[in-house]
Amino acid sequence: MLKLLWLACLPAAYVNTVFTQTVAYASTEFGITEQGQGFAAAIVRWGVIIAIPLASYADKVGRRRVIIGLAWIAPLIISLGALSPSFTFLVATQTIGRPLGIALTVFVLVFATEEMGTNTRAWALSILAVGSGVGAGSAVGAIPLAGISDSSWRLVYLIGIAWLAVAYVLTRSLPETKRFLALHEEQTHHTDVETHIHRDRLWLQIAVAVLTNVFVATASIFQSRYLKDVRGYSALEISMFITLTTIPATVGLVVGGRLADKVGRKAVAIATVPTGTLLFASSFALQGFAMWLIAIVGGVLLGISYPAMAVFRSELFPTAHRNMASILIMVASLIGGSVGLIVAGYLLDNGMSYGRVMLTFALGPVIVAALVAAKYPETAHRELEDINPEDAHLQGS
């Protein structure tokens, strides 16, 4: 089961990554400023609202059907970027395609949370994150194609069609989650079965997601531009930097998953979120060996923090609303982060240094660590039905 979900993460991550890695090159062809790039990235993120009805549909008809549909549609739409006659057309295709990839990622994580055991949920998400890293890495690895000519960035979008092979495998082999089948059976025989989204948990996670994504979105969008314009890196050098600083973070993901399942989500998150963020932000103010080293260490710590923070999003909500809650958190995260992108683009265009912008935005994840310490429940070693008592009736189904 985990192997199939891992495969599903490949196209999802590619679709999610390709625009952030190529926007600097597309902007060169179309003459777009850094502020314009930030605004475009914000628009693409706002498109995530189209995932809300998909989440509602997945909670009603099942995870499998929606995951398979998105695995087919998302790569096809994203590949239309290769045909862009203008920057506006490119942004339009990604405003539709990228949110579908994001929705695919969210639904896969929900699927894994429902299927994995009490002491392996965070670890499973860490393994899926490695798959996402491979998918995203394939987009990063294709960056040298963007350096061939002013318009060769289009090739990076075109090769995304190859991910349709994964959709074929999922169509043939992916089952439905046992928890959803139990819920569906219960609802069929007892029409009065009702659950609700815990609003306090939802608003808390929305706040945490927004504060985190203000930094993450800005760092991911402007890293290539920083390396290209400030450090004078070529397309190949940018690809090497991102790849070589990301690989160690993959080890951090697996370690973080094990730690989150063994010692608890809260301890891992509190220790690694602020330190990893501040270190990674500092890499935008450094150069040479120091820039590489700090980016690697910061990336490893953020990798360790990811499974603990990610698993909360689906653990804290009942089966009937797990996809919807997860998508609402993601929507708020991306829309909130888009505001950060616009602000960052404005600040950079008006002379503020990359290092100062990133360190300012790093305050968000520092606040997140405090919120996790004060407000989050510990979910390690607990069944989902224990965390969400309204699902207790499903255990006997």
What name fits each language-model region?
Residues 1-34, 219-224, 340:
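Extracytoplasmic
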Residues 15, 96-108, 298-309:
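Core transmembrane helices of Major Facilitator Superfamily
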Residues 19-20, 200-253:
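Extracytoplasmic gate region of multi-pass secondary transporters
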Residues 31, 62, 83-88, 232, ...:
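Helix-breaking motifs and short loop linkers at transmembrane-helix boundaries and internal kinks
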Residues 41-56, 243-255:
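Central cavity-lining transmembrane alpha-helices of secondary-active solute carriers
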Residues 50-85, 260-266:
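Conserved MFS/SLC helix-loop-helix module at the cytosolic interface between two early adjacent transmembrane helices
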Residues 93-130:
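Cytoplasmic helix-loop-helix junction between adjacent transmembrane helices
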Residues 120-147, 163, 327-341:
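Glycine-rich segments within core transmembrane alpha-helices of 12-TM secondary carriers
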